[in-house]
């Protein structure tokens, strides 16, 4: 890289690398991040207990301290990940300067660059002002598209454009979206992709008519819980961010969601509520850090396209309910550590595309996998039928034959029971109970 000849670039890169290394080391020492649902429940318990201060405590002290420890660990992870993100951003900027052969300290060209930037800003501001003026004059403004304008700031006044249905400010330099955006009662489509957003405002949950939301390619580390209130959403794209988790209740609320893109993030798990998205048609979660899927994933009865590829060493198993995804047409499980497909995989009769590359599969055998999706379905279906037949055979055999004792204690219990029955019968006989006429005759003979 020619830029490394500049001392300022070299110094900045050295500092940035050191900071990145320190932040990563700290995160490694902290260990795995706690599960998001566990963090949510722990926070709720701590908050409820604090609210009852002075009253009777319903949570044992040991459990309460464990909840506080979970919350502290989560907050520590947040702090170090923020430091890591900031250091990586500096390193990326230094690397870009080195690739371009520039010195970070550019006194000669600074005035010209500033002047050019000022000119661009002025042009953008004029365009923004024109839109706002049109709205203030009472003229209908249903769609605003300010794409690739180097926009750094979105005025609060945008939240007062009544009747606005589409707002597209993709590929700009926005770091913040104003809270006032929650005032766009009629907004149906919001595109914020390819900006520099670190967070979204909680007021986004007020957009009750929002149908399409694209926040891909930003710097988001989480989505606000309020996003679950956007119940009209049918498409949500949050790909290419740094998401470590999704809101706990997202699936309970977004029941109309059809397409969900969360690939290229840092997700360790999907919330169990996602299984309630009965309208979900497409789920793309490739290139994350998923350790598994919710056990009830099979409840996604409308799912047709599922991409779970490239979760690498983390994804090893699929839940038993996977075979209930009866409408699945396309499935990508490549680049994982899956050893066996679920026994009921053969039930996926509508499956047309299947990618199992780069997995240590033993079931089905690789010679079957190499023959294609139809061969895999046929093999797994036959295996499933064999399993069902064997279970049925065992069930019939168990029903037709009495249960025999299989352990010494079982034999002893059965023997004692038999002796008790015999002795009871003998006592009854000798005491004269239940004697028939034939019994009396025998007594007379002796």
Curated annotation (Swiss-Prot):
It holds the Pfam family LRR_1. GO terms for biological process: intracellular signal transduction. Residues 101-121 are annotated as: Disordered. Widely expressed. InterPro entries: Leu-rich_rpt (IPR001611), Leu-rich_rpt_typical-subtyp (IPR003591), LRR_dom_sf (IPR032675), LRR_domain-containing (IPR050216). Keywords: Coiled coil, Leucine-rich repeat, Repeat. LRR repeats lie at residues 138-160, 161-184, 185-207, 208-230, 232-254, 255-277, 279-300, 301-324, 325-347, 349-371. Belongs to the SHOC2 family. This is Plant intracellular Ras-group-related LRR protein 3. It comes from Oryza sativa subsp. japonica.
